[in-house]
Amino acid sequence: MESTLSAQNIRRLLANETPIIDVRAPIEFNQGAMPNAINLPLMNNEERAAVGTCYKQHGSQKAVELGHQLVKGEIKAHRVAAWREACERFPSGFICCARGGMRSHIVQKWLAEIGIDYPLIEGGYKALRQATIEMTNELVQRPIILIGGCTGNGKTTLVRSLPEGIDLEGFAHHRGSSFGRTVEAQFAQATFENYLAVDMLKKSSYHSRWVLEDEGRAIGANGLPESLRIQMATAHLVVVDDPFERRMARLKEEYFDRMTHDFIEAYGEEKGWQEYSDYLHHGLYAIRRRLGAQRAAELTQLLDNALAAQKISANTEVHFSWLSPLLKEYYDPMYRYQLSKKQDKIIYTGSYEEVEQWFANH
């Protein structure tokens, strides 16, 4: 049985989207996981905490004994059945725990007892995590081109359409502004970084450069890896500059049409509408100090009126009453100021289609 993976084999495992049965507790998995991992824990959070306390107070042997007491009988049978099903679904996968230690070996042993020979990752999640950090630091050294432009210019769509594009906002489950959250919760920082690293690794054999959206230090709660930020700070910039009306049409579809649909699909009609309303209010509230108290109150009233009108008519263009001044008075001046400090890095400016063609030719 192959149970020891070299660093190169770990990279191959990640690049090939090899399934990983992660047997850590959910709390550990939620703090950092790999893209192709499923969480089927040996111990749940409470059991893990109890064993950890026992280990501190009474040592390793007592902790192991407690673990076996907690996971036996029907509980053990249920978990073994779940691992068996996963092994049958993913015959080429690997078992993973925190460091490739006792938990992986116990699961491997219990599977062997029912006739399933399944390998584990020596070094566990820690080895995988170290590999993704090293991969990121190495791969970001390739040339980077950033796509910039005011909000609504389709930058994210353009990045996603390019084979060498790296979709930072997609991995972050966030679009970067105060209105950037999506229905999906953001990943833990380590998980975000792992997804980014694995995507770059998978594309690295076919592309010698990266195209990314011009982002700040963080996208919502997810910070960009320092090695990537350093490279982005000196990267060339291509700017998308579409007419205002076209930008508004994109924002209508993305922030109102799609978000209404996504919230209602996720939460149901009544709660979904309330979540959608709260989402827009929170976005405006987050920038109230920069708008000034009076202007923030005026735009909030326009937002309330627009929501009431949308609920009756299902027409989302009613939000232009507050979105248009918000762009003209706040977002556009802010981005143009930021862009003025990067003039020496701009190598091309054009409409969405012109920038699309520029990338096809360069």
Swiss-Prot record:
Keywords: Selenium, Transferase. The active site is at C97. PROSITE patterns: RHODANESE_3. The keyword Phosphoprotein does not apply. Residues 14-137 form the Rhodanese domain. GO terms for biological process: tRNA wobble uridine modification. It catalyses: 5-methylaminomethyl-2-thiouridine(34) in tRNA + selenophosphate + (2E)-geranyl diphosphate + H2O + H(+) = 5-methylaminomethyl-2-selenouridine(34) in tRNA + (2E)-thiogeraniol + phosphate + diphosphate; 5-methylaminomethyl-2-thiouridine(34) in tRNA + (2E)-geranyl diphosphate = 5-methylaminomethyl-S-(2E)-geranyl-thiouridine(34) in tRNA + diphosphate; 5-methylaminomethyl-S-(2E)-geranyl-thiouridine(34) in tRNA + selenophosphate + H(+) = 5-methylaminomethyl-2-(Se-phospho)selenouridine(34) in tRNA + (2E)-thiogeraniol; 5-methylaminomethyl-2-(Se-phospho)selenouridine(34) in tRNA + H2O = 5-methylaminomethyl-2-selenouridine(34) in tRNA + phosphate. It is an enzyme of class 2 (transferase). Its EC number is 2.9.1.3. GO terms for molecular function: transferase activity, transferring alkyl or aryl (other than methyl) groups; tRNA 2-selenouridine synthase activity. It comes from the Bacteria. Involved in the post-transcriptional modification of the uridine at the wobble position (U34) of tRNA(Lys), tRNA(Glu) and tRNA(Gln). Catalyzes the conversion of 2-thiouridine (S2U-RNA) to 2-selenouridine (Se2U-RNA). Acts in a two-step process involving geranylation of 2-thiouridine (S2U) to S-geranyl-2-thiouridine (geS2U) and subsequent selenation of the latter derivative to 2-selenouridine (Se2U) in the tRNA chain. HAMAP family: tRNA_sel_U_synth (MF_01622). Belongs to the SelU family. PANTHER family: TRNA 2-SELENOURIDINE SYNTHASE. Monomer. This is tRNA 2-selenouridine synthase. It comes from Proteus mirabilis (strain HI4320). The lineage of its organism: Bacteria, Pseudomonadati, Pseudomonadota, Gammaproteobacteria, Enterobacterales.
